[in-house]
Amino acid sequence: MAGHNKWSKVKRLKAVTDARKGKVFSRLSRDITLAAKAGGGDPNGNARLRTLLLKARDANMPADNVDRAVKKGTGELPGVVFEEITYEGYGPGGVAFIVKVTTDNKQRAAQEIRSVFLRWGGNLATTGAVSFQFLHAGQFLIPGAQISEDALMEVALDAGADDVITSEQGYEVRCNIHAFDKVAQALDQKGLKPDSAMIAYLPTTTVPVTDPQLAQSITRLHDALDELDDVQDVFSNDEIDESILPAS
């Protein structure tokens, strides 16, 4: 969940979304539609779409749902017009939050997000209030067993990635958002399957959290935001010691 703890966040989100397949499919449908609208319906020429189609396959999303989402994006089928919006706010303990939303109703989305922030001890902030604490970049999390560090660095950096970070869990590849499609395509051609591939907000400064009650409040705010239908992703800059959280 913590903004800095990338792999734990992926693991936690997988556990949450596995229990809410309907919302997973809804989110994927929106993302696929937007990707097809922006870059066309051919995944061979649209790396963002290809990445999402792989996500849909891994989530066992029905092929008919995927096909409809693509055709809505290309205009072959009528559909609701969605808009991508980013909201910023502060949670308990001064933790910064960025919430990515895909919605057909900006007013509803803003009201729901504001309500959740207030309910869990935070507040919605103005644009730019917290985003300076994050790096807006492409991010790929790749299990270490799939490839060696040297081989990954060669593939990723040749494709335009800015950095490859190694940890016990695996590798994190970062790139400029404009290089995301090219890097995604290069990793795919190498046969790599990232645990996560997304345009993310990566914290450049973090807020250490050692108090169990504060950690729970931050976690609950994160989860409550994630539960909202219009919310696609939630990023935060907390640095929670996971040993203080209750066992899940």
Swiss-Prot record:
Gene Ontology annotations of biological process type: regulation of DNA-templated transcription
Keyword annotations: Cytoplasm, DNA-binding, Transcription, Transcription regulation
Cellular localization per UniProt: Cytoplasm
Domain of life: Bacteria
GO molecular-function terms, A-Z: DNA binding
UniProt entry tagged with the keyword Transmembrane helix: no
GO cellular component entries: cytosol
Chief localization: cytoplasm
Family: Belongs to the TACO1 family.
Name listed for the protein in its UniProt record: Probable transcriptional regulatory protein Oter_1471
Organism the protein comes from: Opitutus terrae (strain DSM 11246 / JCM 15787 / PB90-1)
